[in-house]
Amino acid sequence: MAKKPETLSRIADNKKAAFNYFFEERHEAGMVLHGWEVKALREGKVQLTDGYVVIREGELYLIGCQINPLKTASTHVSPDAVRTKKLLLHKDEIKRLTAKVEQKGYTLVPLNLHWTNGRAKCEIALAKGKAEHDKRDTIKEREGKREVERAMKSRHR
């Protein structure tokens, strides 16, 4: 029997990450979640903008990602919306990332949360912070693209 095609649907994006960082490597990590968190993710009750990834004792943790509990899904437990979540990667990937993060200027940032074959995954990136002038260049490029699109749209009318 043929394999089903891999399905991927986005839950949340960290749009500020692209503005604040240059990305060098991307990795897809699994997440250790509680049942109420999975239900909240299915409803899209997550905020990723304040999240960041740290390495402690050879393991990756997602900190600051806010998953707001559903009122009906978590009646018997007291959910913590900003609980630290463990990320799952292979040991050799973690070692390589640890070596690069120890260099000056590098950090790990979460890019998005998505479903891959029914499992919640977090895409993380090895990133280097942008300087203020780089951020200004990004804004100029974005505004330039908008103006070109507006001009093209008005031409076709």
Curated annotation (Swiss-Prot):
Subcellular location: Cytoplasm
Annotated region (Disordered), positions in chain: 132-157
Keywords: Cytoplasm, RNA-binding
SUPFAM superfamilies in UniProt: Small protein B (SmpB)
PROSITE patterns hit by this protein: SSRP
Main subcellular location: cytoplasm
GO cellular component: cytosol
GO molecular function: RNA binding
Matches recorded under Gene3D superfamilies: 2.40.280.10
Coiled coil: none
Entries under InterPro entries matching the protein: SmpB, SsrA-bd_prot, SsrA-bd_prot_CS
GO biological process: trans-translation
PANTHER family: SSRA-BINDING PROTEIN, TMRNA-BINDING COMPONENT OF TRANS-TRANSLATION TAGGING COMPLEX
Record-stated family: Belongs to the SmpB family.
Function: Required for rescue of stalled ribosomes mediated by trans-translation. Binds to transfer-messenger RNA (tmRNA), required for stable association of tmRNA with ribosomes. tmRNA and SmpB together mimic tRNA shape, replacing the anticodon stem-loop with SmpB. tmRNA is encoded by the ssrA gene; the 2 termini fold to resemble tRNA(Ala) and it encodes a 'tag peptide', a short internal open reading frame. During trans-translation Ala-aminoacylated tmRNA acts like a tRNA, entering the A-site of stalled ribosomes, displacing the stalled mRNA.
Protein name from the UniProt record: SsrA-binding protein
Source organism of the structure: Paracidovorax citrulli (strain AAC00-1) (Acidovorax citrulli)
Gene: smpB
